[in-house]
UniProtKB/Swiss-Prot annotation:
Species name: Homo sapiens (Human)
Region of interest: Disordered: 32-53, 148-169
Highest rank taxon of the organism: Eukaryota
Protein name per Swiss-Prot or TrEMBL: Putative uncharacterized protein encoded by LINC01356
Length: 169
């Protein structure tokens, strides 16, 4: 028996059903079987020998579109907050060094003047000196030079305690 010229029902993309000819659309689903078919319910009339509607073997759409893949566990996803490090035979030292360099590359770690000043502020005799260093420093290179040189001037004497106490220089 040829299906040429027979009508099938296909589900429209908004949920409606439309009668289409065989071979017109890939998602054609059910056969319309003449007077036994109820077009309102897209089912055969009760008591009719018409077959129940079923999908054609050439249908492209999934029979259960609401059943999707399970969501993977968060442990199986790559973490966005920390870099994935395979275990290394060197132990924790290389891991710590890699994390430090990784953070420094991203700009999260700044070995700069504020941390150094916070560390040096514990000693009471250099408190004003640290504040003057922090006010005078403009770049990380200047900060490094100020920390290495001991916050002293070219002549070897201490810098003034604050910006207003400089004499005439």
């Amino acid at each position: 028996m040829s299906l040429r010229g027979r009508f099938y029902y296909c589900r429209h993309f908004r949920g409606r059903k439309q009668a289409r000819r065989v071979g017109e659309l890939p998602e054609v689903t059910e056969l319309v079987s003449g007077p036994d078919w109820n077009p309102n319910t897209s089912q055969p009339m009760p008591g009719s020998p018409a077959p129940a509607p079923r999908r054609l073997p050439g249908c492209q759409r999934h029979p259960h579109p609401f059943k999707c893949c399970p969501v993977p566990a968060p442990q199986s996803l790559p973490s966005t907050t920390r870099p994935h490090l395979p275990p290394t035979p060197q132990g924790q030292a290389s891991r710590w060094l890699f994390l430090f360099l990784f953070q420094k590359l991203r700009g999260e770690t700044d070995v700069c003047v504020p941390d150094a000043c916070r560390w040096r502020r514990r000693s009471r005799e250099t408190r004003g000196e640290n504040q003057s260093v922090r006010a005078a420093v403009r770049s990380p290179d200047q900060a490094f030079h100020a920390l290495v040189s001991g916050s002293r001037g070219r002549e070897g004497r201490l810098r003034p305690q604050c910006a207003g106490s400089a004499g005439g220089a």
